[in-house]
Each structure stands twice: as structure tokens, then as C-alpha cells.
A protein has these predicted regions:
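Active-site-proximal loop/helix segment associated with metal-binding centers of metalloenzymes
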Residues: 108-170, 175-186
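Binuclear metal-dependent phosphoesterase catalytic core
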Residues: 100-101, 183, 190-209, 217-255
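Active-site neighborhood of phospho(di)ester-bond hydrolases with catalytic His/Asp-centered motifs
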Residues: 5-7, 32-37, 63-68, 93-97, ...
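Hydrophobic alpha-helical segments and helix pairs
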Residues: 77-132
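A short helix->loop->beta-strand "cap" motif at the edges of active sites that frequently abuts
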Residues: 57-61, 166-167, 208-209, 226-227
Length: 255
């Protein structure tokens, strides 16, 4: 199976929508995976209908994981809860803490909110827009909420990997599963814990074939044990991140 993957399309931004509208992507996969930050869920409608018609027509399934930005605009994370799916076309939809079996492959899909340790709490809660743009059960998102969601997502991923009877396993998250894929110029950032959680020990001892991530707006691939860690983020077109980070609309992995 060929799995074409990308993330951080940010269709809520005019420049990004325009870029995608006028640059039709090649079809290189059987399945398309979108690893978060695609559009605002609060609108309850997918923007750029032409793009979704194209995606629906060209892939067996289009699997989307919600990113942190998908909840922006003071959307309440718990409106949908911690486990949900939403298909807005027959074969296109969002999946939060869900497993989708396609042929002999289990796709384990989760935002995987990161873990923020106490020493980082002040810097992250004051330096990350998530805590100003997102609600949780009617109140502004807190670090405790973030960590609670992280633990739920991580427990779900670990349980799903352990229970899988599929021949192949692909994990899809928005947040980074290891600091090995944090860009060198961000390694000393005070808010790194809002982006990556070190799961290397779990990954190396697992039978995960590939892990697709987004969020960081830097595309760094790695291998941990036998697991390929891959990303393909468009990022902010108005900052030319699609150029500086080497976004490849046709990037795929074969499982």
C-alpha cells in the first residue's frame, strides 16, 4: 500500500488556500493521510470544496487527524470529546483516537497532545496560542488539561498497538513522538515540550512500521528501531515555509 501524507495545510489562511487551489497535487498514494492543522473545526464545514472533491475522487480513503490549530477560534475540545470521527465525504474524514483498518494495515490516529512538565509550565502556557485560542469543558485550556489529553492519547496509542492484529501498523499524530525530529535551531526552545514528547523507548520496542507527524513546520525524517518517522508539512505559505522546509506534495511511504 502506498500512503501519501502531508500536514499543516492551514486552509483557514488565505495564502495557503490560494496555493492549494492553484497547485493541484500529484496523486502518488492509495490512501491520503493528513496529520493535522487542516482547517478550523468550529465552522462545521470543510473549506475549499474543490480540494476535497479531488481528494475523495483520487484516494480510497482520506484520513485526517485533528491538530492543535483545528481547535482554534475558542472551539471547545470537549464538544466532540476525546474519541470521535467525522466524515464529511463518504471516504474523507477526521479521526480522533480511532483505529481504521484498510486491507492489512491498522492506522492508529490521534492528536497526541504533548506532555508539559512542571518546569516548562509558565513558558508554554504564556508562549503558546493554544492556551488563548482553545477551550476545554467551557474554560480556557490549561496545562493540566493539556497533560490530561496527552495521557489519554498516549494510552490509546499504546493499547491500540498492543491489540492490533493487522500485519502492518501506521501511527498518525499531529504532535511529534520524539525529540529526534525537533529542528536543531529549536532544540533549546523553552516551549519544546508543547511540540514533542520523547517516546523513543516505546517506539523501538514496538512493531509500528511508520509514524507520521506534523505540527513543527520543519520536515525531518528519522528511523527508530524499525519504525520510520516521517513528516511532510506545508506550513505557512506567507512565510515561504513550503519552500524552506522542502514540502513535497507527492511524498509517500510504501507499507
Amino acid at each position: 500500500m502506498k500512503i501519501q501524507h502531508m500536514s499543516d495545510l492551514h486552509l483557514e489562511l488565505t495564502d495557503n488556500s490560494r496555493y492549494i487551489k492553484y497547485n493541484e497535487f500529484p496523486v502518488t498514494g492509495d490512501v491520503l493521510v493528513l496529520a493535522g492543522d487542516i482547517f478550523y473545526l468550529r465552522n462545521d464545514v470543510a473549506p475549499l470544496e474543490r480540494f476535497w472533491k479531488w481528494a475523495s475522487a483520487n484516494y480510497r480513503q482520506v484520513l485526517i487527524v485533528p491538530g492543535n490549530h483545528d481547535y482554534y477560534g475558542r472551539y471547545d475540545v470537549m464538544t466532540k470529546g476525546m474519541q470521535w470521527s467525522w466524515k464529511f465525504k463518504e471516504n474523507v474524514g477526521y479521526y480522533q483516537n480511532q483505529v481504521v483498518r484498510i486491507d492489512n494495515v491498522d492506522f492508529i490516529l490521534s492528536t497526541l497532545w504533548s506532555h508539559i512538565p512542571p518546569m516548562d509550565e509558565y513558558a508554554v502556557s504564556h508562549g503558546l496560542n493554544d492556551f488563548y485560542q482553545t477551550l476545554y469543558n467551557g474554560h480556557r485550556l490549561t496545562v493540566d488539561d493539556y497533560n490530561r489529553m496527552h495521557q489519554f492519547c498516549l494510552d490509546f496509542i499504546k493499547w491500540s498497538v498492543a491489540e492490533s492484529t493487522a500485519e502492518k501498523i501506521v501511527v498518525v499524530t499531529h504532535h511529534l513522538p520524539t525529540r529526534q525530529v525537533v529542528a536543531p535551531h529549536h532544540q533549546d526552545s523553552l516551549i519544546n515540550s508543547a511540540f514533542a514528547t520523547e517516546l523513543g523507548d516505546f517506539i523501538v520496542n514496538s512493531r509500528i512500521d511508520a509514524w507520521i507527524y506534523g505540527h513543527s513546520h520543519t520536515n525531518i525524517d528519522a528511523t527508530i528501531g524499525k519504525t520510520k518517522i516521517v513528516s511532510n508539512q506545508l506550513g505557512y505559505v506567507f512565510h515561504n515555509e513550503h519552500l524552506s522546509n522542502g514540502f513535497d506534495a507527492g511524498k509517500y511511504i510504501e507499507i
